[in-house]
UniProtKB/Swiss-Prot annotation:
Heterodimers with gpn1 or gpn3. Binds to RNA polymerase II (RNAPII). PANTHER family: GPN-LOOP GTPASE 2, XPA-BINDING PROTEIN 1-RELATED. InterPro entries: Gpn, Gpn2, P-loop_NTPase. The record marks N87 as: Stabilizes the phosphate intermediate. This is GPN-loop GTPase 2. GO terms for molecular function: GTP binding; hydrolase activity. Belongs to the GPN-loop GTPase family.
Length: 303
């Protein structure tokens, strides 16, 4: 495991804003790394400097990543030395990062002002109930990194009512646990027709409309018919909170990627400018003033 001596400049703390960025989260296979690379390419096209921060100790080093957790420790190393399985080793890596966060802080200080793309691990419990990663993200926020969580979910779950209800529960739990501005994304929309026919229009899934219709779709299966009451209660919880909606995304469609970036920029506050400007801008919005995003050309969130 690497030396964790802190190399950040304490004097730099007089500048409170480290930068803006996205914490890209979601289950395995949802397309996080592909999204990160596509988003970096889009940002470069728009003239916005960005850096990929690979926080997944399990994957191979992200091509072009400015910082990789594997510089500090790798999953295989932890599994070998501590005789842990893959899941236990990944949790250990996150806890190790949590305890040695000055290492990451020092690396990010050298990239101050860059737009950060945090490529996070795919283990679901890291976002739903384990404390390490949410604590890391909160502490980065306290150090001046304004993050928005981008939660990717494979759109194939829309083709199965039971799986979609499960995804809704996971998304809600993640939003409540991570406690960041949050954008849920249905990824791989270009493949959705290959997954099977949807029971409802796409808007039904993205806007999470009346879930009672989805529960009714489960009654054709004897197993789910026996647990209909459970699914009804889960649907009630999701709709009572009223927090979960999705944005559709196809990496092959630049327009959909720009729409996600625009939503992220608004959620994180990037559109409202740097620290000295942002309070006034936010207050203008709060009192109903006519705010023009074009006031800050370098922070144009319209794409």
């Amino acid at each position: 495991m690497a030396d964790t001596d802190c190399k950040w400049d304490p004097g730099a703390d007089k500048y409170p804003l480290l930068g803006f960025g996205q914490a890209v989260i979601g289950p395995p296979g949802s397309g996080k790394s592909t999204y990160v690379r596509a988003m970096q390419a889009l940002l470069a096209q728009m003239g916005r400097k960005s850096a990929i921060i690979n926080l997944d100790p399990a994957g191979e080093d992200e091509p072009g990543a400015a910082v990789s957790l594997r510089e500090l420790l790798g999953l295989e190393e932890v599994m070998s030395e501590l005789r842990l399985g893959p899941n236990g080793a990944l949790l250990y890596c996150m806890e190790y990062l949590q305890e040695n966060l000055d290492w990451l802080r020092g690396r990010l200080q050298g990239l101050r002002g860059t737009y950060f793309l945090l490529d996070c691990p795919g283990q679901v419990e890291l976002y739903t109930h384990h404390p390490a990663l949410p604590d890391v993200l909160r502490r980065l926020g306290a150090w001046g990194l304004r993050l928005c969580a981008v939660h990717l979910v494979d759109s194939h779950y829309c083709t199965d009512p039971a799986k979609f209800i499960s995804v809704l529960c996971t998304s809600l739990s993640t939003m409540l646990h991570v406690e960041l501005p949050h954008i849920n994304v249905l990824s791989k929309m270009d493949l959705i027709e290959q997954y099977g026919r949807l029971a409802f229009n796409l808007d039904y899934y993205t806007e999470v409309m009346d879930l009672s219709y989805l529960v009714e779709q489960l009654t054709s299966d004897p197993f789910f018919r026996r647990h209909k009451r459970l699914h009804e209660k889960l649907a009630e919880v999701i709709q009572d909170y009223g927090l979960v909606t999705f944005m559709p995304l196809s990496i092959k469609d630049e327009k959909s990627l720009r729409l996600v970036l625009s939503a992220v920029d608004k959620a994180s506050g990037f559109c409202f400018g740097e620290t000295k400007q942002s309070l006034g801008n936010l207050m203008s919005v709060a009192v109903g003033a006519d705010f023009q995003f074009t006031s800050y050309p370098s922070h144009d969130c319209r794409g």
